[in-house]
Amino acid sequence: MSEFIPTWKQPSHPETLQVIKGATPYTASARSLVALPAGALFSKITTAIPAPKKTYTSVQTGPGLNIELMSDLVYCNHSCSPSLEFDMSTFEVRVSRDRPLSVGDELTFFYPSTEWDMVQPFNCFCGSQNCLGLIAGSQDMEASVLSRYWLNPHVKDLLAGKQMTVAPESTEEISLKA
């Protein structure tokens, strides 16, 4: 799979983010050009289009629903200590609730906050002291780990459904005879 080529006019967010191209494929990133308080609106998502299938650049908006951002927001990488939250229920990108954003900060979000499963899982190298290692989507993560993060409503709903379908711990035989 080759690195994608943007089809939108760049820069798409010249006042708020700068794309930094890496020396090798898949190493581009985005840096903040603004300082904002925790929880502040960073950007609305206004250029997205439905994605006919899940890709490594798509963002999940609901069960079986994905979009392509069609903007430089696609360069916001994953981090286990994210600087942003992608709220797909409001199509807004906000500064993480637990810390402010400074000029020069890398723009990142916690991919499992939007993704139930991923077409291209990867080993995380975010460098956070809380780095989780393999990132493959929220369906493969422990609820106790996910509880430390802000999650989109569709991910919370899918997690609730998953917890309801987990088999009981009991090894006793259950009789269904009337």
Swiss-Prot record:
<protein>
    <recommendedName>
        <fullName>Methyltransferase flvH</fullName>
        <ecNumber>2.1.1.-</ecNumber>
    </recommendedName>
</protein>
<feature type="binding site">
    <location>
        <position position="131"/>
    </location>
    <ligand>
        <name>Zn(2+)</name>
    </ligand>
</feature>
<keyword id="KW-0479">Metal-binding</keyword>
<keyword id="KW-0808">Transferase</keyword>
<dbReference type="GO" id="GO:0046872">
    <property type="term" value="F:metal ion binding"/>
</dbReference>
<feature type="binding site">
    <location>
        <position position="126"/>
    </location>
    <ligand>
        <name>Zn(2+)</name>
    </ligand>
</feature>
<comment type="function">
    <text>Methyltransferase; part of the gene cluster that mediates the biosynthesis of flavunoidine, an alkaloidal terpenoid with a tetracyclic cage-like core connected to dimethylcadaverine via a C-N bond and acylated with 5,5-dimethyl-L-pipecolate. The tetracyclic core is synthesized by the terpene cyclase flvE and the cytochrome P450 monooxygenase flvD.</text>
</comment>
<dbReference type="GO" id="GO:0032259">
    <property type="term" value="P:methylation"/>
</dbReference>
<keyword id="KW-0489">Methyltransferase</keyword>
<dbReference type="GO" id="GO:0008168">
    <property type="term" value="F:methyltransferase activity"/>
</dbReference>
<dbReference type="InterPro" id="IPR003616">
    <property type="entry name" value="Post-SET_dom"/>
</dbReference>
<comment type="pathway">
    <text>Secondary metabolite biosynthesis; terpenoid biosynthesis.</text>
</comment>
<feature type="domain" description="Post-SET">
    <location>
        <begin position="120"/>
        <end position="136"/>
    </location>
</feature>
<comment type="similarity">
    <text>Belongs to the class V-like SAM-binding methyltransferase superfamily.</text>
</comment>
<dbReference type="InterPro" id="IPR046341">
    <property type="entry name" value="SET_dom_sf"/>
</dbReference>
<dbReference type="InterPro" id="IPR053201">
    <property type="entry name" value="Flavunoidine_N-MTase"/>
</dbReference>
<keyword id="KW-0862">Zinc</keyword>
<dbReference type="GO" id="GO:0016114">
    <property type="term" value="P:terpenoid biosynthetic process"/>
</dbReference>
<feature type="binding site">
    <location>
        <position position="124"/>
    </location>
    <ligand>
        <name>Zn(2+)</name>
    </ligand>
</feature>
